[in-house]
Amino acid sequence: HLEAVPREAADPAINARRAAARKRGAEQRIERLKAALEQIPEVTETKKRSGAKDATVRVSTTDPEARVMKMGDGGFRPAFNVQFATTTDQARVIVGVDVINRGSDSGQSTPMLAQIEQRTGVRPDEMLVAGGYAQHEAIDKADELEVTVYAPVPAPRKDDTRDPHEPLADDSEAVAAWRKRMGTDEAKKIYKQRAATAETVNADAKQHRGLDQFSVRGLKKVLGSASLFALTYNILRLISLGG
């Protein structure tokens, strides 16, 4: 081994391969930096729209399409927001998949409804979603599509004595109905189904299928990984049901 080191160092072919590898690595780093710089205007505009107090713009050079998001442990890291839609019947299969590079779920329920109908040929009668999806505009749109929304009503920000389930003067009919509905025991019972479906899928994806950290880069490839998980999950569900 001791004699092999100087021989390898003097071998022109080995040196050429190493130089080529270093050059490729440098070129790839430059391309990632260029891609990150191209993302800055979009990230800046998103920060302005969200009213963020911190104007600092951060773009990942490892994956320029990822965005810095708050994690469950309280830290901030580049990430993607994976969205799944799951049925609440006995099958409990995934019928919708999407990936976005925003930490907020705002505005995602409407396109997911369209995707579910496109994939299954059926529009759901009810939609059980987390509070982040419950924007008034989304509730109005769901009502137009004759879909009943079940989502937590946020507590009043200023007047903590006000009943959040009582409609406000500027509420639309759909939003007012949603507030009243979520104050009933029946709605609360229905909403509990979400924990046994959506949260189960999310836990399986992160804890058992490795979707807590992707081995690919870019929205398109991450969506491919999420879709592959959904396919695998559905096959395993059908097997467990004797299908």
Predicted regions and their residues:
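Anion-binding and metal-coordination hotspots
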Residues: 1-243
